[in-house]
A protein has these predicted regions:
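A conserved active-site cap/scaffold subdomain adjacent to cofactor or substrate pockets
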Residues: 12-47
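His/Asp/Glu-enriched, well-ordered alpha-helical/loop segment
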Residues: 19, 41, 46, 52-128
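C-terminal cap of metal-dependent C-N hydrolases
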Residues: 62-65, 119-168
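Short helix/loop capping segments that flank catalytic or ligand/cofactor-binding pockets
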Residues: 8, 168-169
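A generic local structural motif
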Residues: 31-35, 109-111, 145-146
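A short acidic, glycine-rich active-site loop
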Residues: 20-30, 67-72, 145-151
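Short acidic, glycine/serine/threonine-rich loops at helix termini
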Residues: 8-14, 57-61, 135-137
Length: 169
């Protein structure tokens, strides 16, 4: 399940902002609510992002000429935390399970765990940090995000992969 389908609806496309031109396309509010319900019930096993960055010039064209795709790595957790966890739609535990153990199972990887003797692969989260999404905050090659200008709560503070800190805010 792509995280943006749990947050946005097809109403966002009315602006013809090329940063909301994505595939699969956004759906109705009723569809979004059905997906949220499926997430709550456990029918959705993992939530991810397809992260499709595009150069600015590719998106600064009329809507119909712009390529499909948006970034998502920098905003996925914060958007879901803000729009699903804080209003009580799903628990933090459910969100974290669907964004970590769920994808690991889907790809046949060992489920993440913190244990002595196990090489660390984890993120440290700042659950209270409120921030505004700006182009300068992106580490990706581009910032073609539907979330530009949005205020979100919660963000990744540190990422440890194979026992090494690979990102730190």
């Amino acid at each position: 399940m792509l995280f943006r389908s749990l947050v946005l609806t097809d109403e966002a496309v009315r602006s013809l902002d090329t940063n909301v031109k994505m595939n699969p396309p956004l759906r109705s509010a009723d569809d979004r609510e059905s997906l949220r319900d499926a997430l709550r019930r456990g029918a959705i096993a993992c939530v991810a992002t397809d992260h499709a960055p595009h150069a600015r010039h590719e998106k600064e064209v009329p809507f119909e000429d712009a390529p499909f795709g948006v970034t998502g790595l920098e905003t996925a957790f914060a958007a879901l935390h803000t729009h699903l966890v804080l209003p009580g739609i799903v628990s933090l535990e459910t969100l974290l399970e669907r964004m970590s153990a769920g994808p690991a199972r889907a790809f046949g990887l060992p489920e993440p765990r913190i244990e002595a003797g196990i090489t660390a692969n984890l993120v440290v989260l700042d659950l209270a940090g409120e921030w505004t999404v700006t182009e300068e905050g992106f580490r990706s090659l581009s910032a073609n995000s539907w979330a530009l200008g949005a205020t979100l709560t919660g963000q990744v503070a540190k990422t440890v992969a194979d026992g090494r800190v690979v990102f730190e805010r």
